[in-house]
């Protein structure tokens, strides 16, 4: 169960200030809360989390136990860096009404984001890819649902940059602690 809860929390934290949530909010504001959009959000969250979980299951069989903890530390550090350096894109001038196009964009955004990297790392570290996948999908889907429901006011109601920077700092501190623990410096 730790894999499920850790994946849920880290995925949700990583998604709050992320591009997929921002894009979802902007599209929802423009399209008027289209129900198809929320279905696409959940579908892409599930598919990308499943891909990350599958990749983690494969990697777990290839790694030594000590390397698994360092992989989690690396995931935390890279995710921290991604959130720190992320620039929000401009709102689409003429967003498409095609749910297929929206699905492709959300899929591309999510397949390489911090939340999926956490699902991958937690699948490797815990040996529970199904639980990590479920947690990642639930955490990501919940944030995308919130972005969808708030629509155009997502950016106005949430201080996204301070949230993103705060979460980045938390992930960096966690990366240092996990790395020191994996190396046996702290116990």
Report residues per predicted region.
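Juxtamembrane transmembrane-helix termini in multi-pass membrane transport proteins
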Residues: 2-57, 118-137
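Interfacial loop-to-helix junctions that mark the boundaries of transmembrane helices
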Residues: 58-69, 127-136, 158-166, 187
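Membrane helix-loop-helix hairpins that form the core translocation module of multi-pass transporters
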Residues: 32-88, 146-155
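Hydrophobic alpha-helical transmembrane segments in multi-pass integral membrane proteins
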Residues: 108-121, 172-187
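Interfacial loop-to-transmembrane junctions
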Residues: 149-172
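Transmembrane helix exit motif
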Residues: 73-95, 174-187
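Small-residue-rich segments of transmembrane alpha-helices in multi-pass membrane proteins
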Residues: 44-48, 99-111, 165-177
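Small-residue-enriched transmembrane helix starts and helix-helix packing motifs
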Residues: 1-16, 84-111, 134, 138
């Amino acid at each position: 169960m730790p894999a499920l809860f850790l994946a849920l929390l880290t995925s949700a934290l990583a998604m709050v200030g992320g591009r997929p949530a921002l894009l979802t909010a902007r599209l929802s504001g423009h399209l008027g809360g289209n129900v198809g959009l929320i279905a696409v959000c959940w579908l892409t969250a599930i598919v990308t989390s499943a891909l990350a979980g599958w990749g983690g299951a494969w990697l777990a069989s290839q790694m030594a136990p000590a390397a698994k903890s360092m992989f989690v530390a690396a995931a935390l550090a890279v995710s921290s860096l991604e959130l720190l350096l992320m620039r929000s894109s401009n709102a689409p001038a003429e967003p498409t009404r095609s749910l297929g196009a929206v699905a492709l964009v959300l899929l591309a955004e999510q397949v390489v984001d911090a939340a999926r990297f956490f699902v991958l790392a937690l699948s490797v570290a815990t040996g529970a890819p199904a639980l990590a996948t479920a947690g990642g999908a639930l955490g990501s889907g919940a944030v995308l649902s919130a972005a969808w429901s708030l629509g155009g006011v997502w950016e106005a109601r949430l201080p996204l940059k301070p949230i993103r920077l705060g979460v980045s700092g938390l992930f960096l501190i966690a990366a240092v602690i996990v790395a020191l623990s994996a190396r046996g410096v702290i116990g």
